[in-house]
């Protein structure tokens, strides 16, 4: 429900309640018209001398008498309910005004920040893809799986180099590539750089199934490069 509609409902309720005027001595007459406490006895109901209590409208003006008869008994309760409803509505309006939606400028800033974050993540991913040329990989194997003729239950982490070396690593590689493209080195076959180990792990020593001691050297890569 919109704010202007809520305000209109509050105004209508307040005007409907306030449209019934209160007479000047209505409250006094209302108090006199209440029944007395049962503990005070029957004498207080009919008066000490047996006379009938005074009519609360006796001292009212004619227009007040007519208004008094038209006012419902629960008029004050209805009025309090309407006032309480209006107060709750005003509090709700204040809370809703404090939660205003972001302006167009704020939405633009949020969108710009989100786009910047997405672009930065994309740039990092692109860099990782470009640098995935020659990389060091690892696999868990048994020594027997190496195919070197050893029968043993010993295991190891075999590291190897994988990837391409299309991007020249040095100026020398760039020159060789340019000369090959321009066919300046027709008689000589120049090999392209390949991804190979430039450093190896430490030696691996183990016992085979016949309890014979063996040592493997330069068996696993430690660092890779295009050479």
UniProtKB/Swiss-Prot annotation:
Q: What is its main location?
A: secreted
Q: Which residues are glycosylated?
A: 142, 178
Q: Which Pfam families match?
A: TGF_beta
User: Which UniProt keywords are given for this protein, alphabetically ordered?
Assistant: Cleavage on pair of basic residues, Disulfide bond, Glycoprotein, Growth factor, Secreted, Signal
**Propeptide segments, given as residue ranges:** 20-93
Question: Which GO CC annotations does the UniProt entry carry?
Answer: extracellular region; extracellular space
**Which SMART domains did the record assign?**
TGFB
Could you confirm whether the keyword Aminoacyl-tRNA synthetase appears in this record? no
As for subcellular location, the record says: Secreted
Q: Where is this region: Disordered?
A: 32-61, 93-113
Q: Which cysteines are joined by disulfide bonds?
A: 134-195, 161-224, 165-226
PROSITE patterns assigned to the protein according to its UniProt record, in alphabetical order: TGF_BETA_2 (PS51362)
Please list the GO biological process terms of this entry. Answer: branching involved in ureteric bud morphogenesis; enteric nervous system development; glial cell-derived neurotrophic factor receptor signaling pathway; metanephros development; mRNA stabilization; negative regulation of neuron apoptotic process; neural crest cell migration; neuron projection development
For molecular function, the Gene Ontology terms on record are: glial cell-derived neurotrophic factor receptor binding; growth factor activity; protein homodimerization activity; receptor tyrosine kinase binding
Q: Which PANTHER family match?
A: GDNF SUBFAMILY OF TGF-BETA FAMILY, GLIAL CELL LINE-DERIVED NEUROTROPHIC FACTOR
Subunit and interaction comment: Homodimer; disulfide-linked. Interacts with GFRA1 coreceptor and RET: forms a 2:2:2 ternary complex composed of GDNF ligand, GFRA1 and RET receptor.
Function summary: Neurotrophic factor that enhances survival and morphological differentiation of dopaminergic neurons and increases their high-affinity dopamine uptake. Acts by binding to its coreceptor, GFRA1, leading to autophosphorylation and activation of the RET receptor.
Family of the protein in this entry: Belongs to the TGF-beta family. GDNF subfamily.
Q: What is this protein called?
A: Glial cell line-derived neurotrophic factor
Species of origin reads: Xenopus laevis (African clawed frog)
